[in-house]
Amino acid sequence: HLVGSDYFGNGHCPEGWNPDYWYDMKTYLDELSDEDKVKSRDPKESYKIDFSEKFTYAYRCSERAIKYLETYKDKDFFLSVSYDEPHGPSLCPAPFNHMYDGFKFDDCPNFQDDLSKKPFMQRLWAGKKLHAAKDEINKSSDGLSLFLGCNSFVDYEIGRVLDKIKEVAPDAMVIFTSDHGDMLGAHRLFSKNAAAHKEGAN
């Protein structure tokens, strides 16, 4: 099992799970030096020439999952793999770190939503963006590029696990779930919050 007692985890493998493969964010951070712990929270690390996928949480989760599948391919098993990425700081190696440079979304009417017919909480959430020009909301940025690149990187890492499943357990049932997306300027909103807009729900 590759997730902890909650989103972050406490570094302790719960009873009933295999400690040789169990992994959470606390376990990941414990593997890092103090210097690398700081780097693991800095999006600029993605642009350094020596930044490797092996540094990322996603890569390490996939590696454990692949080893688990190789070990238990001839037995009945349950495997849960949970990734932290693309959550910020959206670390990802080349070529994903520059894959979406300069990208911006096609114009959409909801970038100009004044939220006047939405709950007051959403207008508070929008903050200064509530009265910003459309070009200030829908624009290219390093943050957007890295976030989208990290999404593609996680797709790649998930693909590595799926490829191994096809190889060693082609009859396995795969269930894919996710928690939420990012508003990315839709309805003048960013990040996530208590709203049921399709842009923020997966």
Pin down the residues of each PLM region:
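A long, amphipathic alpha-helix that forms part
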Residues: 56-70, 107, 133-172
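Catalytic-site neighborhoods of secreted/periplasmic enzymes
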Residues: 1-52, 191-192
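Beta-strand elements within well-structured catalytic alpha/beta cores of enzymes
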Residues: 77-82, 147, 151-154, 158, ...
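Short glycine/proline-rich turn/loop motifs
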Residues: 39-50, 125-145, 202
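Catalytic metal-binding/acid-base residues of hydrolase active sites
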Residues: 1, 84, 181
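Histidine-centered active-site microenvironments of extracellular/periplasmic hydrolases
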Residues: 89-94, 164-202
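Active-site regions of oxyanion-processing enzymes, predominantly non-cytosolic
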Residues: 4-24, 57-114, 168-173
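Acceptor-binding helix/loop patch of EC 2.4 sugar-transfer enzymes
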Residues: 98-136
